[in-house]
């Protein structure tokens, strides 16, 4: 079993996008399902994942490093789901790219708000 097959089996959304063009290079099966995507060719990450027409104002591309994850939280306005996000600079087919792992914590957030 190769790495892509393993990533496709995860419950977390995992995607890779080109650092310079924002082109969506890969998204795992759970990500495709959550975002309603089939064919990702020529899609920009900001359009496919956030429904935006230009790069996200909260994009972390400029601060990503190869040796550590940048961890943050965000609510996806397209799906209205809340995520813990882990972003990292990687090489994908020889080019710099962004790896993002998104853990959906919406239910946990809803419970926290209801008991607060």
Locate predicted features.
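Per-ARNT-Sim (PAS) sensory domains and their PAS-associated C-terminal
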Residues: 65-84, 90-96
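Signal-transmission coiled-coil "S-helix" linker that connects upstream sensory/regulatory modules
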Residues: 4, 8, 39, 109, ...
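Terminal output helix/cap of sensory domains in signal transduction proteins
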Residues: 47-75
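Sensory input modules used in signal transduction
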Residues: 16, 86-89, 102
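Sensory modules in modular signal-transduction proteins
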Residues: 1-22, 29
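PAS/PAS-like sensory domain cap-loop motif
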Residues: 31-41
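Residues that scaffold the ATP/ADP-binding catalytic core of kinase and kinase-like folds
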Residues: 34-35, 48, 111
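Sensory coupling linkers of modular signal transduction proteins
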Residues: 95-116
């Amino acid at each position: 079993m190769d790495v892509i097959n393993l990533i496709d089996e995860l419950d977390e959304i995992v995607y890779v996008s080109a650092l310079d063009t924002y082109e969506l290079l890969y998204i795992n099966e759970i990500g495709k399902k959550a975002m309603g995507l089939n064919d990702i060719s020529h899609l920009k990450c900001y359009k496919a994942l956030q429904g935006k027409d230009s790069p996200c104002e909260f994009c972390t591309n400029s601060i990503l490093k190869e040796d550590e994850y940048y961890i943050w939280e965000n609510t996806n306005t397209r799906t209205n789901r809340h995520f813990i996000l882990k972003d990292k600079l990687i090489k994908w087919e020889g080019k710099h790219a962004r790896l993002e792992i998104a853990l959906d914590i919406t239910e946990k957030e809803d419970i926290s708000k209801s008991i607060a």
